Amino acid sequence: MLYALLLLFGGVSTVSSLRVAVVGEGVIGLSTATAILDLAEKRNIPAPEIHIFHHKPFEKILSRHIAGLFRIDSGSEIDRKYGYDTFEKLATLWREYGGLSGVQLVSGHILSDSKTKLDSQRESYGSLVYNYRDLAEPELFGPTSLFDLPRNTTTRGIHYTAYTSEGLRFCPFLKKELMTKGVRFTQRRIGNLEELGAEFDVVVNSAGLLGGVLAGDDAGNMKPIRGVLIRVDAPWQKHFLYRDFSTITIPVIDHVYMGTVKQEGAFGPNNVTSADIQDITSRYVALQPSFKRVHMLSSFVGYRPGRKQVRVEKQIRETNGSKKFTVVHNYGHSGNGFTLGYGSAVHAAHIVLDLPLDAYHGLVPEPLPINATISEWVKYLDD
């Protein structure tokens, strides 16, 4: 709370001298910079200088290719807090900008043979999204139903309304807003956090899958989760549809995403294969036969930053020149980056601005044990 106290008692005339580097131009890095500026404005604190570093062009990063449907995988208390704060931000953007922000209001259905899995959805976010309910039998079974499922099946379903925040539009929107507020962007590979510590007071690590490697103490707690999405031309598809969380379509503003695979620990192949296409399309067409007639526009393979829990932590480090600086980690969102991203960014922003963390007391889990082991996947995916 040093900055806040000094500001209160007149020891610092502004906080604009605080220099913040953010590593990562994906949804987490952009959201963190946005949250820092949002929180500074809300608390009437002069905004710090922010500089975002990224080593890949936007077209090649995971966030560029994500549909971004709001859905919380884990029902942990901290994830529900992050989800709530993200949902509030998405609702604000939808009201003010609509689709210009990349945010879209959409309804849809999730089907599963597991009642436990469906019940966990209600626990995780049922009270947060709009219109959450169980699907009735007439919606599931019979010739006038949505799905015409056989009556002897154990399949059940839920319906809800929420937001998508498609990376193709949402991330450029955030970047444009940040640039109008003076945030700088530089394409440059950062080898270690100390490299930036000499120049900045705070370094935010939002490096996604490579966040653990960059941290220097967490590489072994990260794992890639290979995923594939196919972008298709199906303008009549207005509702998202999931079957057991891996067979999906998500409509966004002007096209539909179909997927997916979730291959934990896989670090190849780095291209979409014919086997990927066959696997995804055959599963989805069995769910919704009309999709055998859609046209594929593009496809993408990416690696979700798998971790047992999101890492939002503060460290005090020292450069080789003995200059102390603050590190704030914000990575490890697995497949929930667009759902938890702004919420975890608000948490990180509180740390960056040295503000009280009362809202997070009792919610944040114990940190994972230090594990700096560099796994084989790093040399294949660190390009």
From Swiss-Prot:
<protein>
    <recommendedName>
        <fullName>D-aspartate oxidase 3</fullName>
        <ecNumber>1.4.3.1</ecNumber>
    </recommendedName>
</protein>
<feature type="glycosylation site" description="N-linked (GlcNAc...) asparagine">
    <location>
        <position position="371"/>
    </location>
</feature>
<dbReference type="GO" id="GO:0008445">
    <property type="term" value="F:D-aspartate oxidase activity"/>
</dbReference>
<dbReference type="Pfam" id="PF01266">
    <property type="entry name" value="DAO"/>
</dbReference>
<dbReference type="GO" id="GO:0071949">
    <property type="term" value="F:FAD binding"/>
</dbReference>
<keyword id="KW-0285">Flavoprotein</keyword>
<dbReference type="GO" id="GO:0003884">
    <property type="term" value="F:D-amino-acid oxidase activity"/>
</dbReference>
<keyword id="KW-0560">Oxidoreductase</keyword>
<feature type="binding site">
    <location>
        <position position="339"/>
    </location>
    <ligand>
        <name>FAD</name>
    </ligand>
</feature>
<dbReference type="GO" id="GO:0005737">
    <property type="term" value="C:cytoplasm"/>
</dbReference>
<keyword id="KW-0325">Glycoprotein</keyword>
<feature type="signal peptide">
    <location>
        <begin position="1"/>
        <end position="17"/>
    </location>
</feature>
<keyword id="KW-0274">FAD</keyword>
<dbReference type="InterPro" id="IPR023209">
    <property type="entry name" value="DAO"/>
</dbReference>
<comment type="similarity">
    <text>Belongs to the DAMOX/DASOX family.</text>
</comment>
<dbReference type="GO" id="GO:0047821">
    <property type="term" value="F:D-glutamate oxidase activity"/>
</dbReference>
<dbReference type="InterPro" id="IPR006181">
    <property type="entry name" value="D-amino_acid_oxidase_CS"/>
</dbReference>
<keyword id="KW-0732">Signal</keyword>
<comment type="function">
    <text>Selectively catalyzes the oxidative deamination of acidic amino acids. Plays a role in the egg-laying events and maturation processes of the reproductive organs.</text>
</comment>
<feature type="glycosylation site" description="N-linked (GlcNAc...) asparagine">
    <location>
        <position position="152"/>
    </location>
</feature>
<feature type="glycosylation site" description="N-linked (GlcNAc...) asparagine">
    <location>
        <position position="271"/>
    </location>
</feature>
<feature type="glycosylation site" description="N-linked (GlcNAc...) asparagine">
    <location>
        <position position="320"/>
    </location>
</feature>
<feature type="binding site">
    <location>
        <position position="56"/>
    </location>
    <ligand>
        <name>FAD</name>
    </ligand>
</feature>
<feature type="binding site">
    <location>
        <position position="63"/>
    </location>
    <ligand>
        <name>FAD</name>
    </ligand>
</feature>
<dbReference type="GO" id="GO:0019478">
    <property type="term" value="P:D-amino acid catabolic process"/>
</dbReference>
<dbReference type="InterPro" id="IPR006076">
    <property type="entry name" value="FAD-dep_OxRdtase"/>
</dbReference>
<keyword id="KW-0964">Secreted</keyword>
<dbReference type="GO" id="GO:0005576">
    <property type="term" value="C:extracellular region"/>
</dbReference>
